[in-house]
């Protein structure tokens, strides 16, 4: 039997930290370091019988947040990708192997929105997270093939 070569390899990068994940519904062109705490202020928790809402100001704009827990036995991972393209030894027919290193993990996602909390049907970002969770439940991966 021919050995199967993975296209993507997932590695643990030392000890991964448990982080807070946030999803902002906006485009930010800057991709360098940023002093986030200089611009992210006034965290307020408002709770009633049905919802818990977090309100913050980011550079003068009010954002409303809703925290979603990942399902039991699920862990979110922030990965850094090394696509392996700098290796000139691979032929054109050979697909280069990418290595993804787990940088940190998360168990909850804070969804931020400029509007008040909306239902899943109206909020494309919340719907997207819920769809990814459903998708993840259908994906199976046999790690023993690559050991």
UniProtKB/Swiss-Prot annotation:
InterPro entries: RNase_H2_suC. It holds the Pfam family RNase_H2_suC. It comes from the Eukaryota. One of its GO terms (cellular component) is nucleus. One of its GO terms (biological process) is removal of RNA primer involved in mitotic DNA replication. Gene3D superfamilies: 2.40.128.680. This is Uncharacterized protein C12B10.15c.
């Amino acid at each position: 039997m021919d050995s199967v070569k993975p296209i993507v390899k997932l590695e643990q990068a030392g000890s991964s930290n448990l982080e807070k994940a946030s999803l902002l519904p906006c485009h930010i062109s800057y991709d360098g370091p940023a002093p986030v705490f200089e611009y992210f202020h006034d965290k307020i928790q408002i709770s009633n019988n049905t919802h818990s809402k977090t309100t913050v100001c980011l550079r003068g704009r009010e954002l409303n947040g809703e925290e979603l827990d990942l399902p039991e036995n699920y862990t979110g991972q922030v990965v850094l990708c090394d696509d392996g393209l700098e290796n000139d030894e691979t032929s054109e027919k050979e697909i280069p192997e990418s290595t993804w290193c787990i940088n940190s993990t998360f168990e909850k996602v804070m969804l931020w929105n400029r509007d008040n909390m909306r239902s899943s049907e109206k909020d494309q970002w919340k719907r997207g997270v819920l769809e990814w969770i459903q998708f993840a439940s259908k994906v199976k991966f046999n790690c023993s093939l690559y050991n």
